[in-house]
Amino acid sequence: MMKLVIALCLIGISAAYVVPVYYEIYPEDATFDEADIEPQLSPAELHHGSIRERRSLQPGAPSFPMPGSQLPTSVSGNVEKQGRNTIATIDAQHKTDRYDVRGTWTKVVDGPGRSKPNFRIGGSYRW
């Protein structure tokens, strides 16, 4: 269950940092029939709606996590190979001028040192 919560948190954070791609609603080479064109509406008859913008990780989009972010919270993940073991690490921290909080989740996911996950949580408060 904990793996699912962590995976969903990472998906949510990555979706928040993705840049939307704008597509042209009416391209220049499109053709319209005269029967399909709607008459002009008065301001009282206007209908307001929104178009959902698609998100994309295309070139030019900011990297994750965003460098130089002004947010006090940061989350980072890492998968590395140490000898024959593969270790996954997720680190989250929140820093303000009054306190610091940090949490780390580590697990050997593959190899002879395979084990249950380790958790570390710590904090400090400045008077």
UniProtKB/Swiss-Prot annotation:
Residues 45-56 have a biased composition (Basic and acidic residues). The keyword Signal applies. Residues 70-84 have a biased composition (Polar residues). Pfam families: Coleoptericin. Residues 43-84 are annotated as: Disordered. InterPro entries: Coleoptericin. Transmembrane segments: none annotated. Hemolymph. It is found in: Secreted. Residues 1-15 form the signal peptide. Residues 16-55 form a propeptide. Its main location: secreted. Keywords: Antibiotic, Antimicrobial, Cleavage on pair of basic residues, Immunity, Innate immunity, Secreted, Signal. GO terms for cellular component: extracellular region. GO terms for biological process: defense response to bacterium; innate immune response. It comes from the Eukaryota. The keyword Secreted applies. Antibacterial activity against Gram-negative bacteria but not against Gram-positive bacteria. Belongs to the coleoptericin family. This is Holotricin-2. It comes from Holotrichia diomphalia.
